[in-house]
């Protein structure tokens, strides 16, 4: 990246400097330079904040706090700059996912930050959420990446495409239909992601078709490094099937369930006990039957927890829709001005 003329040859700081020296130079720069100058050195700033955070977060809390306060100070400027992205990334590092997502939308960062930096931030956010097993938030960030305007699709967009769809089927047991009409990125990605589309279709069909698709496309999944999501989807596959059967049947033969999952009856019984403890096994005419018992009533405490989870899920969904709307508006504005 070529720096502004004022800094060519004499950058005020460098991310590869000794952390102690970098800390002094960076905090001095943040407090003395304008938003425009920050944006001109955006990649250096992002790399420097990452370097300082990695050096001090957890091991030197007082020094990390200096870094965070400097970034937070710059992010309070009404004019959006790269410092806002750094601020949001540090909120993620601290595990403040809800605050980060809310701030991301309140500050309208997506209207002002270049698409390349926005993409990096959303991917970073998705990784953090995955690392803390917050799958629903990770879905929101991956979904957002698909609607960031770009002239060239990258491996990040491909990763976001299959990660979102696989996470969606992992958490819901359903396939999400991405709308190519609202993003120019979706259609070309979909053409390149046929193995994943076939996997999702097979997942909803039957286990034999699923096995065939996995065998056919396993080398592609390995190449894309998506096998963790594929294996996770397979792990929860019996759970989604059980949920579907529970809605349709009051009882089923264990032999039928084992056949549908292509496993032995003993293994099927273990899986059922793992995923659904509201079932009974009975023997009639030498055959084992699974009876789906009624689920427990929801207590006031559980009702409150479920309501809170629903509120959080609703906020995440609304946030993703707002981001999608903002980015789509930018696309349409560019088309109209072209």
Curated annotation (Swiss-Prot):
Query: At the top level of its lineage, which domain of life is listed?
Result: Eukaryota
- Broad class of where this protein is predominantly found: cytoplasm
Tell where it localizes: Cytoplasm; Nucleus
Give UniProt keywords alphabetically: Cytoplasm, Nucleus, Signalosome
Task: Extract one GO cellular component term from the record.
Answer: nucleus
Q: PROSITE patterns this protein is in?
A: PCI (PS50250)
Biological process (GO) annotations? protein deneddylation; ubiquitin-dependent protein catabolic process
Q: Which residues form the PCI domain?
A: 137-306
Report the protein's function. Component of the COP9 signalosome (CSN) complex that acts as an regulator of the ubiquitin (Ubl) conjugation pathway by mediating the deneddylation of the cullin subunit of SCF-type E3 ubiquitin-protein ligase complexes.
Family as reported in the entry's similarity comment = Belongs to the CSN3 family.
Q: What is known about its subunit structure?
A: Component of the COP9 signalosome (CSN) complex.
What name does UniProt use for this protein?
COP9 signalosome complex subunit 3
Source organism per entry reads: Schizosaccharomyces pombe (strain 972 / ATCC 24843)
């Amino acid at each position: 990246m070529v720096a502004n003329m004022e800094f060519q040859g004499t950058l005020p700081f460098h991310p590869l400097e000794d952390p102690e020296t970098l800390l002094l130079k960076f905090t001095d720069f943040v407090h003395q330079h304008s938003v425009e100058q920050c944006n001109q050195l955006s990649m250096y700033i992002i790399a420097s904040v990452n370097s300082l955070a990695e050096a001090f977060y957890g091991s030197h809390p007082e020094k990390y706090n200096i870094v965070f306060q400097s970034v937070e100070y710059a992010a309070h400027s009404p004019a959006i700059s790269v410092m806002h992205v750094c601020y949001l990334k540090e909120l993620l590092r601290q595990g403040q996912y809800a605050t980060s997502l809310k701030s991301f939308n309140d500050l309208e960062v997506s209207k002002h930050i270049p698409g390349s930096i926005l993409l990096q931030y959303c991917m970073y956010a998705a990784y953090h959420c995955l690392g803390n097993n917050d799958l629903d938030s990770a879905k929101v960030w991956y979904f957002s990446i698909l609607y960031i305007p770009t002239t060239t699709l990258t491996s990040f967009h491909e990763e976001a495409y299959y990660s979102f769809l696989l996470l969606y089927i992992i958490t819901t047991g359903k396939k999400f239909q991405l709308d190519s009409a609202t993003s120019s990125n979706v259609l070309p990605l979909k053409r390149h992601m046929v193995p994943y589309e076939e996997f999702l279709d097979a997942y909803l069909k039957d286990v034999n078709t699923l096995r065939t698709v996995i065998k056919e496309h396993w080398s592609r999944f390995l190449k894309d490094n998506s096998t963790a999501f594929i294996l996770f989807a397979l792990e929860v596959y019996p759970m989604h099937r059980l949920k579907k059967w529970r809605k349709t049947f009051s009882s089923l033969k264990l032999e039928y369930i084992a056949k549908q999952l292509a496993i032995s009856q003993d293994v099927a019984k273990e899986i059922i006990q793992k995923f659904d403890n509201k079932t009974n096994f009975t023997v009639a005419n030498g055959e084992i039957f699974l009876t789906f018992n009624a689920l427990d009533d929801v207590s006031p405490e559980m009702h409150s927890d479920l309501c809170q989870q629903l509120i959080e899920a609703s906020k995440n969904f609304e946030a993703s829709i707002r981001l999608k709307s903002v980015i789509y508006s930018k696309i349409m504005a560019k088309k109209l001005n072209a």
